[in-house]
Each structure stands twice: as structure tokens, then as C-alpha cells.
Curated annotation (Swiss-Prot):
Presence of the UniProt keyword Nucleus in the record: no
Location in the cell: Cytoplasm
Functional note: Involved in the regulation of genetic competence development. Inhibits the activity of ComA, a transcriptional factor that regulates the development of genetic competence. Likely affects the activity of additional regulators, in particular Spo0A.
Lineage of origin: Bacteria, Bacillati, Bacillota, Bacilli, Bacillales
One Pfam family hit: TPR_12
Family to which this protein belongs: Belongs to the Rap family.
InterPro entries with a match to the protein in the record: TPR-like_helical_dom_sf
GO cellular component: cytoplasm
Organism: Bacillus subtilis (strain 168)
Protein name, entry field: Regulatory protein RapK
Entries under Gene3D superfamilies matching the protein: Tetratricopeptide repeat domain
Main localization, broad class: cytoplasm
Length: 371
């Protein structure tokens, strides 16, 4: 039986990558299943195998971001593979750096991610493809968003949005890019604009009939309402996210439970908050998440029991979040804790949390200096 030409498989890989870039999750899953079978019959070609391995990693990241599946440890981003990739072509080398940067950003290794995005950008200049440019802009913007560099992030994401608007097949990407723009407006305290962008993204998600994306957007919109001090709207948005079946089964469900607990405690709905706290404990047994376990424990100990007696538990969980490089969580929860202890006259304890908040701010500013 004759072997399948590697060029034929490479063409199918290109189609797979287009599906990934369009954020077409079901199509990507279909290609992944079909392409694996082709390799048994393909003539040997190391470059095509490398391309497949890169897309496999990118596919995993798509399932994580767009369906809330756990992200497995990468298997391809090694020094040996990098050395091989640099001897191939600009597109493969660009993808290697881009995908590894995304993975490092996910792991909060921001210095490494920044360096890799810089390498990717140099290779991008050799690739005349505006969709590829939009993909790059959106990923870099997301990194800037994570470290609260909102103005720079907006510059990149507006470029991505402009490109995606010219390509109707990329509506899911347009929605997620609009979501990033909304998040940056929220970080700048421009809440009306943030709300407007989120609602626009939700409308786009409805057009695509992507229920998971819609739930994700409602969850993120709830964060805007929380920061805007609109608890009723925050809770309403969270209910829409939590009520979504695909969101319920994803790793992101615990994020919404955390938000609900925080908001209910904030408005003194203690019994309702404890009810969601119990749901969170059940979920954490099924899906371990040490970061959210610590975050939820902090909230519970700030609002339940004798506050002064809960200091050690709260501060130890803050220290754990610091070790995990959860800068935004340390910043937010340290401030809540500081104000709670300050309200009962426990100024020494409050100072410990204010210092933790300052630490987080300084760390984020260090990242800004690198950027």
C-alpha cells in the first residue's frame, strides 16, 4: 500500500490550524481525531511531524480556554525541539515561540512569556497574513491584561478587533478579543465602556451559538459589576454563567462560585454565601484546585467565626498565593482582609495585609518594567 504524501497531510494540518484560529472547537476536535490516523500511512517528514506536534499543543490550549478542560503539562516545548525548529522555516519557528509563550503566560511565567512573544514577533514580520497578526495581537494583549498594563493592551487588542471585523468567519475570535478590550476598560475603571463591550461580545457569542463562550462572558461581566459596586447585576450575571451546563462541568465553574461567595458576603447575605461555600467545597473534592481552595478559605475566614482568631489562616493562604505568583488575587484579597481587620481595630493585622497588597503591586510594576 502506497504512503500518503506528506504534503497532503500538511494541507490538512493547515485546515486544522485555521479551525483553531477561528476558535471552532468542534471542528478542531474532529481534525485532531482524523489527522492522527493519517500519520500511520504518511511518508516520513520531520517538519510535518513537528507542525503536528505544535498544533496538538495549541489544540490542548484551545480546549482549556474555550471549553474549560484541564491543561495538561506540555510535551513539545523542549530545547531539542527548539533547536530543530530553528532549522526549518519561519512559520514553524513563529508558531513554536507563540504557542510556548501562551503556555508560559498561563503558568504565570511572565518574564519567559515576554521573551518568547518578542521572538515570535520577529518571525511574524516574515509572515504576510493579517489573521496571524490578529492572533498575535490578541495573545500579547491578553498578557498585558494579566499584568494590568491596560493602555498597552488596548493598543494591541484594538488592532486585533479591527482585523477580525473584516473576516466574518472569525466571530468567536472577535467575541474573545472584544472581551479582552472590555477587561482592560474595567481595569481602567471605565465601567460603562467595559459593560458595553461585554454586552457586544455576548451578542456575538449568541450569533455563534457558543454556549460556553456566552457563559464565560457573563462570568467576566460579573467581575465588572462587582468592581462597579453593582451587586445585584453581578449576581444576576453569575447566575447566567452558573446555569450553563457546559460551564458547570468546566474547570472555570469554581471561579464563578468564588465570585458568588465574595459578592454575597459583601452584601451581608451570609447564609447564601455559606451555601455557595459548601458547593465550592464539593467541587474542590471533585476537581482539585489549590489556588481557589486558598482564595475561598480566605473569604470564609474573613466573614465567619471570630475574625482575630482567623488571622493566621488568612495570612498563610495569602502567602501561598504569593508563592503561586497569583498577583491579582493577592492584591484583591489582601485589600479585603486589611479593611476587615481595620474595621475591628486590629491595625497590626491589617498592616500585614496592606503590606501584602503593596508587595503584589510592586511585583506587577516589575513586570511592567520588563514589558
Amino acid at each position: 500500500m502506497s504512503k500518503i504524501a506528506s504534503e497532503v497531510v500538511a494541507t490538512t494540518l493547515n485546515d486544522w490550524y485555521i479551525a483553531i484560529k477561528k476558535q471552532k472547537v468542534d471542528e478542531s476536535i474532529k481534525y485532531y481525531s482524523e489527522i492522527k490516523k493519517l500519520f500511520d500511512e504518511m511518508e516520513e517528514d520531520q517538519e510535518v511531524l513537528a507542525y503536528y506536534s505544535l498544533l496538538e499543543e495549541r489544540h490542548k490550549m484551545l480546549l482549556h480556554s474555550s471549553r474549560g478542560e484541564p491543561l495538561q503539562k506540555h510535551t513539545y516545548f523542549t530545547e531539542d525541539n527548539q533547536n530543530f525548529i530553528t532549522k526549518t522555516n519561519d512559520k514553524l519557528e513563529y508558531n513554536f515561540y507563540l504557542f510556548e509563550a501562551m503556555y508560559e503566560a498561563y503558568n504565570k511565567n511572565y518574564d519567559r512569556a515576554i521573551n518568547l512573544y518578542g521572538l515570535a514577533e520577529k518571525k511574524l514580520a516574515e509572515i504576510p497574513d493579517e489573521i496571524e497578526a490578529a492572533e498575535f495581537y490578541s495573545k500579547v494583549s491578553y498578557l498585558y491584561t494579566l499584568v494590568k498594563q491596560s493602555i498597552v493592551a488596548q493598543h494591541y487588542i484594538k488592532n486585533a478587533i479591527s482585523i477580525y471585523k473584516r473576516h466574518p468567519d472569525y466571530k468567536c475570535k472577535l467575541a474573545t478579543s472584544t472581551m479582552i478590550a472590555a477587561a482592560n476598560y474595567a481595569d481602567m475603571k471605565r465601567f460603562e465602556e467595559a459593560e458595553q463591550y461585554y454586552l457586544e461580545a455576548i451578542d456575538i457569542a449568541k450569533e455563534t451559538k457558543d454556549e460556553f463562550l456566552k457563559a464565560q462572558l457573563f462570568h467576566n461581566l460579573s467581575i465588572v459589576y462587582s468592581d462597579w459596586n453593582k451587586p445585584d447585576k453581578c449576581i444576576e450575571s453569575l447566575e447566567k454563567a452558573i446555569g450553563n451546563e457546559s460551564w458547570l462541568h468546566s474547570i472555570y465553574y469554581i471561579n464563578s462560585l468564588f465570585m458568588m461567595i465574595k459578592e454575597l458576603f459583601k452584601i451581608d447575605e451570609k447564609m447564601k454565601a455559606i451555601n455557595f461555600y459548601n458547593k465550592a467545597q464539593e467541587r474542590l473534592i471533585l476537581m482539585e484546585n489549590k489556588v481557589y481552595e486558598a482564595k475561598i478559605s480566605i473569604l470564609y475566614n474573613l466573614y465567619c467565626g471570630e475574625l482575630k482568631n482567623n488571622f493566621n489562616n488568612c495570612i498563610s493562604n495569602i502567602e501561598f498565593l504569593k508563592q503561586q505568583n497569583e498577583l491579582e488575587s493577592v492584591d484583591e484579597l489582601s485589600y479585603i482582609a486589611a479593611k476587615r481587620f481595620e474595621s475591628i481595630g486590629a491595625f497590626e493585622e491589617a498592616t500585614s495585609f496592606f503590606n501584602a497588597k503593596i508587595w503584589a503591586e510592586q511585583k506587577m510594576n516589575q513586570v511592567e518594567g520588563i514589558l
